[in-house]
A protein has these predicted regions:
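Conserved beta-strand hairpin/beta-sheet module of binuclear metal-dependent hydrolase folds
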Residues: 8-68, 158-161, 165-169
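Active-site metal-binding motif and surrounding structural segment of the metallo-beta-lactamase
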Residues: 48, 59-106
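Short, flexible loop segments at the rims of nucleotide/cofactor-binding pockets, characterized by
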Residues: 28-33, 56-58, 82-84, 143-149
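Metallo-beta-lactamase
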Residues: 10-13, 107-195
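Short, Lys/Arg-enriched N-terminal segments with co-localized hydrophobic residues
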Residues: 1-8
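Short coil/turn connectors at secondary-structure junctions
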Residues: 48-49, 77, 101-102, 124-125, ...
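Active-site environment of divalent metal-dependent phosphoester hydrolases
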Residues: 85-90, 112-115, 152-153, 174-177
Length: 195
């Protein structure tokens, strides 16, 4: 079990970072040394409709759930956008569906094939399959989906929110390291190792 640190950050008034640091993980994907741990990145957009951008690995699920419920402040979760099926992005999807059974799961065609491979008997009541250039309006925020296969895996997509000009980049532009441990670290050096 992970010792994770709770982090909630305002990206803007309506977009919140609800990810979790995991400072006890030694090897990412059982092969990459991560002496500074990792951060599992997840965001929530609070508009007329709410959208969760990715979930987190099961190791950080309890803290992420607390972050999410705090950020929602009693509101319903309308959408979850699954940009990447790797467990550090989608590992808590089944728990999210338990919490919000009517949530709409948003992904591309490959995402839904992989969901059924990763989760046995997952009960998705509502789903939305998106393709290149499709949009999803949340109110004052509009999400545009851009396919990015093999940024890491074949189903990867990124999501652009046009009103605030925010790119949710899945595994693109990332690096290893828990945010709480690497706040003042040399970003470029670790990013080079990641890529």
């Amino acid at each position: 079990e992970s010792e994770s640190e709770v982090l909630i950050m305002n990206i803007s008034d309506k977009i919140k970072y609800i990810g979790v640091d995991d400072t006890t993980l030694d090897l990412f994907e059982s092969q990459y040394a991560v002496p500074d741990g990792v951060s599992y990145n997840s965001y929530v957009i609070l508009d007329d409709k709410t959208a969760i951008m990715d979930t987190v690995d099961k190791r950080g699920m309890k803290d992420w759930e607390n972050n999410l419920l705090n950020a929602l402040d009693g509101r319903n979760a309308d959408y979850v956008i699954i940009q990447h099926m790797e467990p550090d992005h989608a590992g808590s999807l089944a728990r999210l569906i338990e919490l919000f059974p009517e949530i709409t799961v948003v992904g591309n065609a490959k995402t839904f094939v992989m969901i059924n491979q990763f989760f046995e008997n997952i009960n998705i009541k509502n789903s939305l399959t998106v393709k290149e250039g499709d949009t999803l309006n949340l109110g004052s925020h509009t999400l545009t989906f851009v396919m990015a296969p093999m940024v890491h895996w074949p189903e990867v997509m990124v999501t652009y929110e046009s009103s605030e000009k925010v790119l949710f980049s899945a595994d693109g532009f990332g690096k290893f390291g828990a945010l709480s441990l690497t706040e003042n670290a040399d970003w470029a050096c670790e990013a080079r190792r990641y890529y």
